[in-house]
Amino acid sequence: MPQPVFRSGHWVPPDLPFYKANFDGALFRDSSSAGIGVVVKDFEGNVIGALSEQIGLPASVVEVEALAYRRAFSFAIEIGLQEVVSEGDSKTIISSLNSDCSCLAHFVHLVEDCRVHAGNLRFSAFTHVRRIYNVVADKLAKKARYLLLPQFWLEDIPVDVSPFVTRQKFYVKPLIKFQLVSSKKIKIKKNKKKFVTYL
């Protein structure tokens, strides 16, 4: 398994050709349920897919985060992705994926399931982000409180969550493609396929 990366600061898009799956969980103790939120975005910050799903109430916050992490990878596979960086705001989960600490025994089976799901991808990695920058997944997880069935979006996002996606795209560095036209001129086009570089 790749080493976890701990990062603070704003949401950071993945490098080409990878996708980033942000995940989060929410507890609804009054209804004995919990919510899972996942949003998958590309290197430009565009939404590839998202989900909001209600589940039974786990024993702890850590367990719902582990379930959300596992769901992030399985959702990525369901929508046909194979190169995925998974990102959440639970340091416990990110650390446990690279640890055999016995103190995690009460949910070790979930950690192992996460590793199995990650192993089904051509490339998988995991990073930590501060909760404030995981807001899209958080909103989707909390949205599950009112759902009877899971909801999925492909290349779309709920209207009430969309402003948070737009705000995160502000930090995406533009990518451009340089194409040699002559020995003296260079034509610049907006990125479509290959030969990209960060400004």
Q: Which stretches of residues belong to each language-model region?
A:
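Primary recognition of RNase H-like, Mg2+-dependent phosphodiesterase/nuclease domains
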Residues: 1-199
